[in-house]
Structure formats: C-alpha cells, structure tokens
C-alpha cells in the first residue's frame, strides 16, 4: 500500500491530515486529527463518515511524527459506494473540521 499526504492544516489548534491510500488499482482517502492524550474522547460518539475507524498513538502512514503526548483519530472513505470523485480533498477536510468541532463542543 502506498500512502500520500494530500493536505495538512491546523483547525482551532488541532492538526488535521488528509491522506490518499493506494492499494493495487484502488484508492481511497482518509482523514486524521491529532489529539492531545490529555483530552478524553469517546470515539464511538463522534459523528463522521463511517464512524471513527482509527484511534492510535502511532501516527498514520505516511506521517513521521513521534510525539508521545499525542494520539490520532480518523475515518476512511473506503466504504461501499465511496469514490474519490465524491470524497475529494476538500470534502475530507470539511469532515475533519466537523470532527474538531464536535471535540471542542463536548459532543464526544
């Protein structure tokens, strides 16, 4: 699998990453938010496309970040009928902003 960082940005103090994954002839996008380990988050209560499918202290590939005080939550756009035409870099970025908004508003 090949992974390419397509976009990184900071939204309200949270680093966000949009990544394209290539597996053979298929490709799909994922989005990740870097979160402080001190911030309690119930990932099951975050409303995003397909739900949170990644929650790990390791930065997702291809990111090379080694920060013991951070962890990462994310979602993927590899569900039935998902396409890269629909799940553009911009749409994934908007979904990441919504996740951050939920974290900040306490909807977690």
Task: Name each model-derived stretch.
Residues 1-108:
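Catalytic phosphate/metal-binding cores of nucleic-acid and nucleotide-processing enzymes, i.e., regions
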